[in-house]
């Protein structure tokens, strides 16, 4: 644990913490096989349905007492109070003095939401209408390129929240996409990304969305300037830029200097965090892909989960339950990571999206009061599509030495007519959660294999089981259920942050590396040997220079 002032008002100081520690000691050796064998109603008591989402959390190392104590932890952490502060627009992002109002972006009730005394809903609704109108022009063939050709390809240039969220949603909703429009996403400042993407496109039929709040983000603007140069190499006239580039930004001067018409700048606000911004104008690529009506369905799904989260009792609250289970394993069992395992090809980018949403939010070691915490906080989030994962890393989940709780996610109704494929997928989804929970004892292994007790190979085929998992079943992957699913995880992250006494909505951890990169960049091509860093960094910079632009004496 880090040194420093560890006096904290967080998790470890709450009265229920000791009760949970004692309860964990009693639960440490309890196997879930016993819990299921002695309680035929376990699924009914530890499952919850909200709209078209079903959460089965019965395959967790919990009892009613566990959940009662964890809910008490949420109460002592004032989760309900912090939840209300967020929804009403209080500035709960204390380090940046900002409200946290991604929920306002999908507030389909249109109830007033005030920031600094102003209802933000009229501006939110106006931007949504502008996005829809623009998208319908492009989709309907009214908006065309400089040569009069239809737009066939849309390239979103952004990074972080301006990339991961929209890309994940566009990919997830591919069955709803416009048949003419292909969506592309460029984020990496590695030149291979932008070069390979643009090589396959035609400047006359390509529309670019440049997503940067300040219009100064280095990676995004480097790619945007390259894209503009690529475009002008064919189009010639800089005036044509306005037909092929739009912006999601708040910096009107920089946008117009780039050549984009200010009328084609879509704004968002400082109370929208990057990793929670897909609901805002950052989601313009989503609207272009699936249309305004489907985008509204996405917002409505998120709003349904928002309403559930805001009003349901903590014990019957889906995001709260997921968060409490995360706290249980992270802070009492010592689990350091959590796997996201979607059994749906269209959700294959969900793990990467949640990596940012969760780890950038709760990857903090200093609490709201500026004190270094004395307890573990954010989990390592990782994962992959389920079937592929089974043939890659599930070995460690089943027979490894680490506890790795997992979320299994599946759609009951597929988008394809390949029912046999889907039946196999569902069977594997169900089998994995059962195998992780129940395992296979030595006696069961001997019986199944027909081997003698002295056979040394038997132990290698024993499965301890008792590995926790949640199962999340969507009736079908639609814009509505996807909105619900994303909001479910957003609120889970919020609740965990409250219990850990963290500000989940800043990200100072990304700043230091960017500052140092700004210092190193000119040194890569300087004349004199570099000596202003540590020995390792100096040597690496000088090695790079020798390999790329040899300088005598380096």
Curated annotation (Swiss-Prot):
Subcellular location: Cytoplasm
Gene3D superfamilies: 1.10.1390.10, Glucose-6-phosphate isomerase like protein, domain 1 (3.40.50.10490)
InterPro entries from the UniProt entry: G6P_Isomerase, G6P_Isomerase_C, Phosphoglucose_isomerase_CS, SIS_dom_sf, SIS_PGI_1, SIS_PGI_2
Protein family (similarity comment): Belongs to the GPI family.
Identification of the protein by name: Glucose-6-phosphate isomerase 2
E.C. code: 5.3.1.9
The encoding gene: pgi2
Catalytic activity: alpha-D-glucose 6-phosphate = beta-D-fructose 6-phosphate
Keywords (A to Z) from UniProt: Cytoplasm, Gluconeogenesis, Glycolysis, Isomerase
Pfam families attached to this UniProt entry: PGI (PF00342)
Catalytic site positions: 360, 391, 514
Pathway, per record: Carbohydrate biosynthesis; gluconeogenesis; Carbohydrate degradation; glycolysis; D-glyceraldehyde 3-phosphate and glycerone phosphate from D-glucose: step 2/4
Enzyme class: isomerase
Lineage: Bacteria, Pseudomonadati, Pseudomonadota, Betaproteobacteria, Nitrosomonadales
């Amino acid at each position: 644990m880090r040194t420093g002032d560890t006096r904290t008002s967080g998790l470890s100081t709450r009265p229920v913490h000791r009760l949970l520690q004692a309860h964990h000691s009693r639960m440490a050796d309890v196997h879930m096989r016993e819990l299921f064998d002695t309680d035929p109603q376990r699924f009914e008591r530890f499952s919850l349905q909200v709209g078209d989402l079903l959460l089965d959390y019965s395959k967790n190392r919990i009892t009613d007492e566990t959940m009662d104590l964890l809910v008490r932890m949420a109460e002592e952490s004032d989760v309900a109070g912090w939840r209300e502060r967020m929804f009403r627009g209080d500035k709960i992002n204390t380090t940046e003095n900002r409200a946290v109002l991604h929920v306002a972006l999908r507030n389909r009730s249109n109830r007033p939401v005030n920031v600094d005394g102003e209802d933000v809903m009229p501006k939110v609704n106006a931007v949504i209408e502008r996005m829809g109108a623009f998208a319908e022009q492009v989709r309907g063939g009214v908006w065309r390129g400089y040569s009069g050709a239809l737009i066939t390809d849309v390239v979103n240039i952004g990074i972080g929240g301006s990339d991961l969220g929209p890309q994940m949603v566009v990919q997830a909703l591919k069955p709803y996409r416009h048949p003419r429009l292909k969506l592309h996403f460029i984020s990496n400042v590695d030149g291979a990304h932008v070069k390979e993407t643009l090589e396959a496109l035609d400047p006359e039929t390509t529309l670019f969305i440049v997503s940067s709040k300040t219009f100064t983000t280095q990676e995004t603007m480097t790619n945007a300037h390259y894209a503009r140069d690529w475009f002008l190499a064919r189009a010639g006239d800089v005036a044509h830029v306005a037909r092929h580039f739009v912006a999601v930004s708040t910096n009107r001067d920089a946008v117009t200097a780039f050549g984009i018409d200010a009328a084609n700048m879509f704004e968002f606000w400082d109370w929208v965090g990057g990793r929670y911004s897909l609901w805002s104008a950052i989601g313009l690529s989503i609207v272009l892909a699936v249309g305004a009506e489907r985008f509204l369905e996405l917002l409505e799904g998120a709003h349904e989960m928002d309403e559930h989260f805001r009003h349901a009792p903590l014990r019957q609250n889906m995001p709260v339950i997921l968060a409490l289970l995360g706290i249980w394993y992270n802070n009492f069992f010592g689990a350091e990571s959590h796997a996201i395992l979607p059994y749906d090809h269209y959700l294959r980018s969900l793990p990467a999206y949640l990596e940012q949403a969760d780890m950038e939010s709760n990857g903090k070691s200093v609490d709201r009061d500026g004190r270094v915490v004395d307890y573990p906080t954010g989990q390592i989030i990782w994962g992959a599509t389920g079937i592929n994962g089974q043939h890659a890393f599930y070995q460690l989940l089943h027979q490894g030495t680490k506890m790795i709780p997992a979320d299994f996610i599946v759609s009951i109704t597929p988008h394809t007519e390949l029912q046999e494929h889907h039946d196999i997928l569902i069977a594997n989804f169900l089998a994995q959660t059962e195998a992780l929970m129940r395992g296979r004892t030595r006696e069961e292994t001997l019986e199944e294999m027909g081997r003698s007790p002295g056979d040394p190979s038997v132990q290698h085929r024993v499965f301890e089981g008792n590995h926790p998992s949640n199962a999340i079943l969507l009736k079908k992957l639609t814009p509505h259920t996807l909105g619900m699913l994303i909001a479910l995880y957003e609120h889970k992250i919020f609740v965990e942050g409250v219990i850990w006494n963290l500000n989940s909505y800043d990200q100072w951890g990304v700043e230091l590396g960017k500052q140092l990169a700004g210092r190193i960049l000119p040194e890569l091509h300087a004349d004199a040997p570099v000596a202003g860093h540590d020995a390792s960094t100096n040597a690496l910079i000088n090695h790079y220079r020798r390999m790329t632009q040899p300088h005598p004496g380096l």
